[in-house]
Amino acid sequence: MYHLFHSRLCLPQGLRSLLAQRMPAAKLLPNDSAVAAYARHRRVVAVGDRVSETLIRHGVKPWVMVFDCVEARRDKTCPSIPEGYAILRTRNERSTVEPGAVEVIRKALRQGHTVVRVDGEEDLLALPALLYGDVGSVVLYGLPGKGVVAAAVNREAKLLAMRVLEFFEPC
C-alpha cells in the first residue's frame, strides 16, 4: 500500500461526488453534542477545523488533530491546541494527497497528542488517516451541510481507503 504515495495523487473528477457522501458503515453524527458523546471514550483522529474545535470545546482531546485554519475556503482562527500537544506542519494542495503529508500523518498517528497544521487543504487526509490509523480508533471528519462522519478504523475501512486512493491519479 505504501507504493501509492511515491508521488502526489490528485482526486479525479469522477470521485468527487462519492467522497461528498458518508462512507459505508460509518456513522453520521448530526450535531456537536452527538460528536462529543461519540468521541469521549475513543481514540480519535479529528480531520478538519470544525471537528477539532468541537471536540476541544467539549473537553475531548483527540489523539491527532489535522486542520488548515480554513473553513468553506475562508481563512479562520485556528482551533486551540491543548497543552502538551506536539505540532507538525505539512503542505497538501487542494484535491490532492501529497507524499510528505502522508508521512506527517503517519508520524502523528505513531506519537499521538499531535496537531498536524496543513498549509493548503486537509480534507483528503482523512483517507491516509484511515489507512494508517490503529484498528479500534475512529476518524472524524466533516461533511458540509450534513454533520460529522465517524469512520471506525478496521480492516474494511482500511481496504476501502486503499481502493479509493488507487483511483487517484499521479499528478
From Swiss-Prot:
What's in the keyword line of the UniProt record?
A: Coenzyme A biosynthesis, GTP-binding, Kinase, Nucleotide-binding, Transferase
The source's superkingdom equals Archaea
The record's PANTHER family line, in alphabetical order, gives: GTP-DEPENDENT DEPHOSPHO-COA KINASE (PTHR40732:SF1), UPF0218 PROTEIN TK1697 (PTHR40732)
- Which reaction(s) are listed as its catalytic activity? 3'-dephospho-CoA + GTP = GDP + CoA + H(+)
Q: Which GO terms describe its molecular function?
A: GTP binding; kinase activity
The role this protein plays is:
Catalyzes the GTP-dependent phosphorylation of the 3'-hydroxyl group of dephosphocoenzyme A to form coenzyme A (CoA).
Name its pathway. Cofactor biosynthesis; coenzyme A biosynthesis
Its protein name is GTP-dependent dephospho-CoA kinase
Give the organism, scientific name: Hyperthermus butylicus (strain DSM 5456 / JCM 9403 / PLM1-5)
Could you tell me which Pfam families the record lists for this protein?
A: DUF359
Q: Does the keyword GTP-binding apply?
A: yes
In the record, the note on similarity to other proteins reads: Belongs to the GTP-dependent DPCK family.
Upper lineage:
Archaea, Thermoproteota, Thermoprotei, Desulfurococcales, Pyrodictiaceae
Q: Which residues bind GTP?
A: D49, V51, D68, E122
